[in-house]
Amino acid sequence: ARVNSAGASFTLLGTKATMLKSTKPVIAVCAVRTGCGKSQTSRKIVELLMEQGLKVVAVRHPMPYGDLIKQKVQRFASIEDLHRHNCSIEEMEEDEPHVIRGNVIYAGVDYEAILRAAEEDPKGCDVVLWDGGNNDFPFYTPDLLVTVVDPHRPGHELSYYPGEITLRQ
């Protein structure tokens, strides 16, 4: 609002201009609001796919705290990896549940490089799972998009931006 009221233009680019295409199937988990349960939903989907014998590599929405050059591409397959990358408490809360289940999760700030690394992960990759953040839409073109809504906040699915985008996709 401050930018617009000062006379400048501000536009959030749409999905066609921002989403990257993967060579692997992509499942994206997003939400209309933060706090709807994306992380729990993501972990359950990973669990179900792993039970089917698929190798799932998760990619987390960025939390750019600290040295962004060092955070270009981060791969977490163990608790030690989380400590080596000096993850914040918030990052640990998101990533630790994946690695203790034996899943690999990527993060960072260069999402083209992250996607290519995930597709070629040393442990293998059959499916990329986008674990969204806040109420943003996915950075990767999903083959399946799961949008989580909060039953305790009815109506919010149509009144929060950009979360409403994922509901309408």
Where are these regions (language model features)?
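Flexible phosphate-sensing "switch/lid" loops adjacent to ATP/NTP-binding sites
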Residues: 1, 27-31, 40, 47-169
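Short, basic phosphate-binding NTP loop
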Residues: 1-28
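Conserved glycine(s) of the Walker
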Residues: 36-37
